[in-house]
Amino acid sequence: MPPSDVTMRVWRGDAKGGAFKDFQVPAAEGMVVLDVIHTLQATQAPDLACRWNCKAGKCGSCSAEINGKPRLMCMTRMDTFQPGETVTVSPIKTFPLVRDLVTDVSYNYEKAREIPSFTPGPKEADGTRRMWQEDVERSQEFRKCIECFLCQDVCHVIRDHPENKKQFAGPRFLMRIAELEMHPLDVNDRLELARAKAGLGFCNITKCCTEVCPEHIHITDNALIPLKERVVTEGYDPLVWLARKLTGK
């Protein structure tokens, strides 16, 4: 089937300002949005800024908002749109714009550095460490994260209230805290970090982060809610409080 033109409405501009611009771009069968953006760069807009790397849905670089929804450009097929539909591509909203479709995501790296790394306890007497298979599988789900930061982008706590960024780590890094906190071999206590510095209390479990995750990680159900339960048990459970009073610990 020969390529047919599609209308691509792409954001052009930088931190000082910009606007959407329409382009007619040929799109062949099997193309994804990133293919069309590359075609646009090659034929009409060579200065269009766009971040990408693997084009296989594994690096998380090509995050954008496509028709208003945070998605990976390399995993969004053109045949999912209606014939004649205008496809709007804009930069992810939550982070400062650098230029065109590229944003400054350094906030995420700053939050990552605030989380203490994996800290294993002493080995068993025979020199090994053992884990139950269910514990292995639980943390494996969280490690599927490709750090596309779509969950960070869609989270209304920082999307609509950028002033919360200093005190809220966002779903990606709360999930990282949960992963380490649930690891049976880790001895570092991160519950106070989750409560006080990472801003777990800001999360009201709307599940928007789970809905946009390209790796289909159950961020809310398997990470955020269990982490909230652990924080509440540790800090507010009357039985835990009584036990501390009696034992002095």
Language model regions located:
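Short, contiguous acidic and Ser/Thr-rich linear segments
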Residues: 20-32
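Eukaryote-biased recognition of intrinsically disordered, low-complexity regulatory segments
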Residues: 3-23
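Ferredoxin-type iron-sulfur electron-transfer modules in oxidoreductases and energy-metabolism complexes
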Residues: 31-43, 90-249
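Short, structured protein-protein interaction patches enriched in aromatics and acidic/basic residues
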Residues: 54-62
